[in-house]
């Protein structure tokens, strides 16, 4: 590849710097194996930025992200900053403004049960044995969380609260295309989640998704009501490939998908805008209780790097190489402490070294 790429690395707080270090080790292996020209710059964010710059999202960090092709984000937050006003705390003061600034409208959350980790799945053993590999595609900027009017009024028995579910055609079209394009890189199936038997917004959602599906004749489309989808995820998650969801339904289903994998330390996420620019981060938190102990699981951060390569740099071969390396490590029984269950565990650094080596070797 001849193009030059630049990644803004925002390690953040807690275990963020430790797991970011491992992801950048793997990036070095990718660079060398695939002859990719990728540079990185580090910027403070979250609590680290509060300590060093007096605010959770300094202008220099935003400017650095603007100059990058993608952002690799660690994690933010911790008890040290909980005394601050909510808007000045690391989570609300950094991550949400970044999403708004870059107009990140789609959230991608993979949820995969890896071979050898079936015992961590809370589902019945016969269901877990089938495995699953799901991508939840959630619309981030529309729907009931942002629709107007919303508020409270009245008093006594007449006091009421209200929210409004609003979706525009363009919002549904663009998130649907993300889902169908993602399915083309996977197993060619989209299941669109709605409540079209009740909600006008869901009726429009279904109509427009059907229209977009005609542009993707190679991708199978199914529709499912949200209540049935929550049950089917427990009954047989292996039936799903890509789940296409509104903001509210995706908020619910992405967490359900995460829970049935059994380990938050394995779950990456991506938030994208219309230009393909993305912010990539682990789905878990900053875990301040284990920070600095070299025991955190870096796989979610490394998988976030794989998503970055696939979606923002269009380097699917490199992303797949990372995923194969992780599969090999897990198949060989290599575990960090969260997955060891009393067996021998490797450190954060050791897991990063192993995955980077497997990428370099082309396993």
Swiss-Prot record:
Its main location: cytoplasm. Pfam families: Iso_dh (PF00180). Binds 1 Mg(2+) or Mn(2+) ion per subunit. InterPro entries: IsoCit/isopropylmalate_DH_CS, IsoPropMal-DH-like_dom, Isopropylmalate_DH. It catalyses: (2R,3S)-3-isopropylmalate + NAD(+) = 4-methyl-2-oxopentanoate + CO2 + NADH. The record marks 145, 195 as: Important for catalysis. It is found in: Cytoplasm. GO terms for biological process: L-leucine biosynthetic process. NAD(+) binds at residues 78-91, 285-297. Homodimer. This is 3-isopropylmalate dehydrogenase. It comes from Shigella dysenteriae serotype 1 (strain Sd197).
């Amino acid at each position: 590849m001849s193009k030059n790429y630049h990644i803004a690395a925002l390690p953040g707080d807690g275990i963020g710097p430790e797991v970011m270090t491992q992801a950048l080790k793997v990036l070095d292996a990718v660079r060398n194996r695939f002859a990719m020209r990728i540079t990185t710059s580090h910027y403070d964010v979250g609590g680290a930025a509060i300590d060093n710059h007096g605010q959770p999202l300094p202008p220099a960090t935003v400017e650095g992200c603007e100059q990058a092709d993608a952002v690799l984000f660690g994690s933010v937050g911790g008890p040290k900053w909980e005394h601050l006003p909510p808007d000045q705390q690391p989570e609300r003061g950094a991550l949400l403004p970044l999403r708004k600034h870059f107009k990140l409208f789609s959230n991608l959350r993979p949820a995969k049960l890896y071979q050898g980790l079936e015992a961590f799945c809370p589902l019945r053993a016969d269901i877990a044995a089938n495995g699953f590999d799901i991508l939840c595609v959630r619309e981030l900027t529309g729907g009931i969380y942002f629709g107007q009017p919303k508020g409270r009024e009245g008093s006594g028995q007449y006091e009421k609260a209200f929210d409004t579910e609003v979706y525009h055609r363009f919002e549904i079209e663009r998130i649907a295309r993300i889902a169908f394009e993602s399915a083309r890189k996977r197993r060619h199936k989209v299941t669109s989640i709605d409540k079209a038997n009740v909600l006008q917004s869901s009726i429009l959602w279904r109509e427009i998704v059907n229209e977009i599906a005609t542009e993707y004749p190679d991708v199978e489309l199914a529709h499912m009501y949200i209540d049935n989808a929550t049950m089917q995820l427990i009954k047989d998650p292996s039936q799903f490939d890509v789940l296409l969801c509104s903001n509210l339904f995706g908020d619910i289903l992405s967490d359900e998908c995460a829970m049935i994998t059994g380990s938050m330390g394995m779950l990456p996420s991506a938030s994208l805008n219309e230009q393909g620019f993305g912010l990539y981060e682990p789905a878990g938190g900053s875990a301040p209780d284990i920070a600095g102990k070299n025991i955190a699981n870096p796989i979610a951060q490394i998988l976030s790097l794989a998503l970055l390569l696939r979606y923002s740099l269009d380097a699917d071969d490199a992303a797949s190489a990372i995923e194969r390396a992780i599969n090999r490590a897990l198949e060989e029984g290599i575990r960090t402490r969260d997955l060891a269950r009393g067996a021998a565990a490797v450190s954060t650094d050791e897991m990063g070294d192993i995955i980077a080596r497997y990428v370099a070797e082309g396993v």
